[in-house]
Amino acid sequence: MQRTRLNTIVEVRGQQLSQFFRNPWRRISLSLLSFLFGFFVGTAVATTAGQNSQWDVVCAAFILLFCELVNRWFYRRGVKMGDLQAEVLNIFKMGVSYSLFLEAFKLGS
């Protein structure tokens, strides 16, 4: 790849962001935000798809496909502990799964 100005800026900003999140407290806060955003997305998808019952099966299939692809990428590859993107995506998936689990409890009661 050519060393253009844009390529250099993106590379430097990525390194600065990676350096910024090396701090354990920032990493924990990013993980917590990812989990809460996943929880919000799962609840929003469940309630939106539940309003129009035609999309229930399609949304469930997409969420299942997303979760399985994240699992395959995260666990098969042997992700290192320092891989922030994989860790944040896996925690987002946990938030989505947990929110759907709680939505099922709400519907069952």
From Swiss-Prot:
InterPro entries cross-referenced by the UniProt entry: Uncharacterised_Ycf20 (IPR007572)
Pfam families in UniProt: DUF565
Family: Belongs to the ycf20 family.
Identification of the protein by name: Ycf20-like protein
Organism: Synechocystis sp. (strain ATCC 27184 / PCC 6803 / Kazusa)
